[in-house]
UniProtKB/Swiss-Prot annotation:
The modification Phosphoserine is found at residues 106, 150, 252, 254, 260, 294, 434, 438, 449, 600-601, 887, 889. A motif (Nuclear localization signal) lies at residues 153-158. This is Phosphatidate phosphatase LPIN1. Acts as a magnesium-dependent phosphatidate phosphatase enzyme which catalyzes the conversion of phosphatidic acid to diacylglycerol during triglyceride, phosphatidylcholine and phosphatidylethanolamine biosynthesis and therefore controls the metabolism of fatty acids at different levels. Is involved in adipocyte differentiation. Recruited at the mitochondrion outer membrane and is involved in mitochondrial fission by converting phosphatidic acid to diacylglycerol. Residues 431-440, 581-590 have a biased composition (Polar residues). May represent a candidate gene for human lipodysytropy syndromes. The modification Phosphothreonine is found at residue 264. It comes from Homo sapiens (Human).
Amino acid sequence: MNYVGQLAGQVFVTVKELYKGLNPATLSGCIDIIVIRQPNGNLQCSPFHVRFGKMGVLRSREKVVDIEINGESVDLHMKLGDNGEAFFVQETDNDQEVIPMHLATSPILSEGASRMECQLKRGSVDRMRGLDPSTPAQVIAPSETPSSSSVVKKRRKRRRKSQLDSLKRDDNMNTSEDEDMFPIEMSSDEAMELLESSRTLPNDIPPFQDDIPEENLSLAVIYPQSASYPNSDREWSPTPSPSGSRPSTPKSDSELVSKSTERTGQKNPEMLWLWGELPQAAKSSSPHKMKESSPLSSRKICDKSHFQAIHSESSDTFSDQSPTLVGGALLDQNKPQTEMQFVNEEDLETLGAAAPLLPMIEELKPPSASVVQTANKTDSPSRKRDKRSRHLGADGVYLDDLTDMDPEVAALYFPKNGDPSGLAKHASDNGARSANQSPQSVGSSGVDSGVESTSDGLRDLPSIAISLCGGLSDHREITKDAFLEQAVSYQQFVDNPAIIDDPNLVVKIGSKYYNWTTAAPLLLAMQAFQKPLPKATVESIMRDKMPKKGGRWWFSWRGRNTTIKEESKPEQCLAGKAHSTGEQPPQLSLATRVKHESSSSDEERAAAKPSNAGHLPLLPNVSYKKTLRLTSEQLKSLKLKNGPNDVVFSVTTQYQGTCRCEGTIYLWNWDDKVIISDIDGTITRSDTLGHILPTLGKDWTHQGIAKLYHKVSQNGYKFLYCSARAIGMADMTRGYLHWVNERGTVLPQGPLLLSPSSLFSALHREVIEKKPEKFKVQCLTDIKNLFFPNTEPFYAAFGNRPADVYSYKQVGVSLNRIFTVNPKGELVQEHAKTNISSYVRLCEVVDHVFPLLKRSHSSDFPCSDTFSNFTFWREPLPPFENQDIHSASA
């Protein structure tokens, strides 16, 4: 009985450790990378598939992934996306290249640079606004009574305690937080709360509209994308943080957070993470639903606004005249807390009139300040709740919210079935706009969720303003002050629409100045297609429509020299979201934006001047996109050695310290011969038990396979292990391959290629559907292309299913060198299926099936062809005299 008890205890401990390894909160993995040296010396690599689990990236430092190769740090860094995936940021200056929205991102900045940039922006805003930097930027709603304050105070034990010292926040970006570690399923009231808070609660504005002069209300209406988006297969992320400063916590494999289908208005598509690509949402199976909520049917131009406002048809209290708070409002200490303060148009123009005003207002408040609370007749959970952490997603649903809720408020959040004005219709109108949020601050990765949307270009549109300052055809440059002095207000334009015919009219789009003839097609493209025109098209229109500046032949020469001089300096990006069309990024820092206000067609292509902080601003034609591959120069900088190179990807976190993800980079030559080997059912005896029994310590390996693979590798062949397992099982699978030991003989080293998809998706595809060829064909084809000009790098392959045979045939493996094995250990050669063998028998004739590869630069003997057994012991040829031949012919 003691023996049985010890055995049961050992099994329990083993299963417990296995569960910890598969825990969705800690599941991370890295797929090995293959680097191929080309004949000309260039290097090509397979994609860097790295994924961190949720606990590993909780409150990470700037979402930057550090890389160590062979124990030494390298200068390259990766960035962390919302799905936990790591990717490189590639700079591109191609005007014609259109970057998809799910691939657009912001540059990676060092901690010191981003901190300096934050201080620079805050200092500039404080000087212009005349505010104390330590003033907390939060608004207290008039409806906040002592009872609501007590409720908020009661919840602070399980929620983040916001600090009031903004200077201390900027010095220490990692705030102390005490909150729930895992999200709970959201109910509709919680979803509505986050939906409304991210939209800055437009329905609560009308009660204050009568108290504020209309001429002071010229607010930009910004609607951040508030609907949820997928993170990994069959999972959905919480709504983005209202502040937009950081995206929510990356979900991990096998975690499922359900959302209401009424809130999204359509069935949630799954996330697809294919080989060599970044995760992105699968296309909807019902496209007609998307058409019902087309952005063209519900979009209006908001009065007093430079932005397009998206109105819900069910919101009867929201009108065109309703101003909306942008990110938050400022609290004047000299006025009662019950008075709501707004940001007027004059202040916004002073701040630079950049396109997304949300990040500018964000700089006026601490990064983790409480969410803006607005007034309403009754208190609701969405009004009393503090803003959650920037990293954590959906909060739990608390019972006191349901019991204390007013019946009228409950009717708003829990509509009856069939109510056309309920939450379902409200969400369906905006369901088509479900997308990832744009990065709202330096180093943020809000755009990194990998979700495409019908409104990708909507939030990228720059600000628009008009003025009668003139100067486009004169010899003077348009300044900000001159533009603001003659700025045209909304009321002036209503009274006199013929202003567009005034020759002094100047249209400011983003940071550029145009006449009306040039600006008209630009504005039409923004309104009709929600995306700006490409830079090449804009330049063509400007050449035809913009007035020529005659008599200034020296100016273009000076601008050309200035451009060359500035482009020769090392580029260092400060802030901003990458624009695929090459337009001026609207989210540059405030100081940088003031520096490079260009006004003429001759100055359009001139680079921006450096700011006083010593940084070079983002060039107008430079954009940034995600990539999983490195260039040849970047690969050479890694200083890889031939064969395996240990690589460690690490993310610094506040609570867990440093989360590390280990892998291997293999440097091979273009003429190497590769042997492909499956794992489940090929090295192990069966598929399902091959996942479980080795973890419990049971040897479930085919007999003789380790010796066979070892002898084949000694003949000069490289091994590649390809399995349809998920990336989260990389460490477990890699450990199993190292654990296999057959009387002192181990498996040869080789790259481990796994599916980048989630755990359950990969298990379902391989074990249930039994269709691993979906992944294998795509993966092996990509690896094959790295060996070009060698079109047949794969010499032989081992598998256990007809699907494996199909995959190997697709990548050019010869049929007579494809071997399949069954659970009994019977090895079959595909071109002669009646000839049944085994790993042990094949090992006896390994030199005939896998002959020794002889190459002058890799052989043990430099002259192996001269000093081999045959050439050394053979009899010399007898001398041959050709004199008789010449005499006979004569």
